[in-house]
Amino acid sequence: MDTNTTSYTPLPGDPFLSGPPETPRRPLKGFAVIFASVIFLMSLVALIIHQGPQQPPDVMPDKQDEHHHPQSTTNTMLSWQRTAFHFQPEKNWMNDPNGPMYYKGWYHFFYQYNPRGAVWGNIVWGHAVSRDLIHWLHLPLAMVADQWYDINGVWTGSATILPNDQIVMLYTGSTNESVQVQCLAYPADHKDPLLTKWVKYSGNPVLVPPPGIGVKDFRDPTTAWYITEGKWRITIGSKVNKTGISLVYDTKDFIKYEQLDGVLHAVPGTGMWECIDFYPVSKTSDKGLDTSQNGADVKHVMKASLDDDRNDYYALGSYNEKTGKWVPDNQKIDVGIGIRYDYGKFYASKTFYDQNKQRRVLWGWIGESDSENADVKKGWASLQGIPRTVLFDQKTGSNLLQWPVEEIEKLRLNKKNFDKVQVKAGSVVPLDVGTATQLDIVAEFQLDQKVVESAAETNEEFSCQTSGGAAKRGALGPFGLLVLADDSLSERTPVYFYVVKGSGGTVNTYFCADQTRSSVATDVVKQVSGSYVPVLKGETLSLRILVDHSIIESFAQGGRTTITTRVYPTQAIYGAARLFLFNNATDTSFTASLQIWQMNSAFIRPFSPDAASHSSFTPVTVFIKFIVPFGIFLTLYFVR
């Protein structure tokens, strides 16, 4: 968006908003000299500490520790489940990603958080910042439930960056009568790159449920996009009976709104739409687009999180700014009845445009698949998926491509290559990678094409969910990897392809993940997930898997189909976790080539509420107490 030609109305009651445009400058420039000096002086002490003896990150506690803790076996299992490089708070419950953005050199991430326990409730906004989307620094809570209009929860919302570095945050508040209303907040000081203090607009709420909409069916405003009439436009999720809808509003000042006639889009039978996302993707470029961009080379993505089945669906289509309507390219795969972002545990997702690297980045909430009692016992629940870049798939023209942000590769340690490993039908091949708890796996599979061509045709409909999992053998599948497996294979999580030759000789490929034997525990969800994955002529079957303790994120064919899996093994943990290739097909062998990296842990520094009260944290104190140590760590981390 061209800020030089954009007209806008400043927010009232905030003096900085009416000031003249500032010359762009590097973030935290004023702190540069102080930071360098402190790094030099304190790194000597930090180096000594750093060079001291350290316990390996993935070893079983010693026997003496077990002797002193009668419940150590259970506690050890629960402790192992906590991830090493996925974002999560130190304790308690977390759900939806909120208001992600890049601002003055920092990535900001807000999230739904319960400061009182490991179950949903008492929802406020947590806040963390990062330089690279991998290493994080927790900050004080951004917003708490302290007003009549949000006393029952500061629910999901989105950030919009306006000209002159203005930021507006629209969020849903649950009132003292549990009515869902839309509220406005903005930073107390837009010059603070950490955005440590937020102000709620005194005239909140700015939107209430319109006539015909239920008081509990009006939530989750999107990032606003600028339209040619000099207004900003947002959409909000709702429903009418069983039809999921997205309401549309225009505003000039984010205080007064005009509701457009009709809706942006609606799909009968899909139920309540929440956490709507609406954004452009380029049909010709591998760069992301600002949310306000439109044009001939642009498609628009409409995504809704379906409250009925707790999955995220998207569709590609065309957006008409004048009518305020969006139309899907293919009604057979419309929102809620077609393609999902992810076929596993992935919900309430939210993208943002990263102007720093000209990319669109996707966050998604990864809930638990164990029991609530287990969550309470371990003291935490849920995490966020590794942020993903999102692009239009120019080859298929019908899919998005999702891929882990490139920064995750900074955590790669020692690498092992396996070239052209032959895996015969009905066999399992161990891969000697050491402890297989934290891995980044890139693999390609080559089937025997003669066998594929001669395979019998079948009219049988295949579904990952109803196929019987990796134990069900077919002529051309399943085959892939056994992740988080123990030596005896009593616990394993297969991530695999299944190829079906249909009538007329068409070959369809499915990508699945099977939890049914992931754990001998009985209080966890065990199901098979996955879907069809487009494989074009001449393409090799490929996948990437990120393994991080209790989460497995899998990407097929460059990210056309993805599956996020939560697993809770009791034996395939710590040093007992292994990795295998497997081929459970009856008629074909395959050749696999793999690159596998051990992964380091991310640095996620907690915020301690005991260190100071929320009100005493200024940009300077936050910098001294948290940013300086954070910088020291990163310096040591990348030079070792």
Swiss-Prot record:
> Which residues are recorded as binding substrate?
93-96, 112, 120, 155-156, 219-220, 274, 307
Q: Where is this region: Disordered?
A: 1-22
**Record field: transmembrane:** 30-49, 617-639
Positions in the Cytoplasmic compartment: 1-29, 640
- Coiled coil ranges: none
Task: State the Gene3D superfamilies in the record.
Answer: Exo-inulinase, domain 1, Glycosyl hydrolase domain, family 43
Q: Which GO terms describe its cellular component?
A: vacuolar membrane
Lumenal side residue ranges read 50-616
Kindly report, in one word, the top-level EC class recorded for this enzyme: hydrolase
Q: Report the SS bond pairs.
A: 464-512
Q: What tissue specificity does the UniProt entry give?
A: Expressed in buds, stems, roots and leaves.
Q: Which reactions is this enzyme annotated as catalysing? A: Hydrolysis of terminal non-reducing beta-D-fructofuranoside residues in beta-D-fructofuranosides
Explain what induces or represses this protein's expression: Not regulated by light during bud burst.
Q: What does UniProt list as catalytic?
A: 96
Output the SUPFAM superfamilies linked to this UniProt entry. Arabinanase/levansucrase/invertase (SSF75005), Concanavalin A-like lectins/glucanases (SSF49899)
Q: How does it sit in the membrane?
A: Multi-pass membrane protein; Single-pass membrane protein
**Compartments (UniProt record):** Membrane; Vacuole membrane
Q: Which GO terms describe its biological process?
A: carbohydrate metabolic process
Chain positions listed as propeptide in the UniProt record: 1-78
The protein's predominant localisation is membrane
Q: Which UniProt keywords apply?
A: Disulfide bond, Glycosidase, Hydrolase, Membrane, Transmembrane, Transmembrane helix, Vacuole, Zymogen
Membership in a protein family = Belongs to the glycosyl hydrolase 32 family.
Database matches in PANTHER family? BETA-FRUCTOFURANOSIDASE, INSOLUBLE ISOENZYME CWINV1-RELATED
Output this protein's name.
Answer: Acid beta-fructofuranosidase 2, vacuolar
